[in-house]
From Swiss-Prot:
GO biological process: cell division; regulation of cell shape
GO CC annotations, alphabetized: cytoplasm
Keywords: Cell cycle, Cell division, Cell shape, Coiled coil, Cytoplasm
Membrane spanning residue stretches: none
Organism of provenance: Bacillus mycoides (strain KBAB4) (Bacillus weihenstephanensis)
Family designation: Belongs to the GpsB family.
This protein's name: Cell cycle protein GpsB
Highest taxon, organism lineage: Bacteria
Function: Divisome component that associates with the complex late in its assembly, after the Z-ring is formed, and is dependent on DivIC and PBP2B for its recruitment to the divisome. Together with EzrA, is a key component of the system that regulates PBP1 localization during cell cycle progression. Its main role could be the removal of PBP1 from the cell pole after pole maturation is completed. Also contributes to the recruitment of PBP1 to the division complex. Not essential for septum formation.
Pfam families: DivIVA (PF05103)
Quaternary context: Forms polymers through the coiled coil domains. Interacts with PBP1, MreC and EzrA.
UniProt subcellular location: Cytoplasm
Gene it is expressed from: gpsB
Amino acid sequence: MISDKIKLTAKDILEKEFKTGMRGYQQEEVDKFLDMIIKDYEAFHKEFDQLKQQNARLKRELEEQKVAATQVPQQPVQTPVAQPVYNNTNTDILKRLSNLEKAVFGSKLYE
């Protein structure tokens, strides 16, 4: 990411010593060093701009999500209505029906 593009640290800049020539510092060495500083600043500036844009985009998306969440109608949660529990199974019902038939019709069914 950004650390791959940056060649200098604050320590490098602070500790940089230029060799002096007959009339002072060597112009080419100073120019090369300043070129490296300029490239680093350009990389920092570019990365900073990208991060600002990304931050703004993410803030917009967050606001859109908040607005969308407030616009969704809150539907009440429907709990399932408890059905009456019958302990009778089909076989129990058939047995009861058979007993009723015997009581009503008596032995006529079995003659």
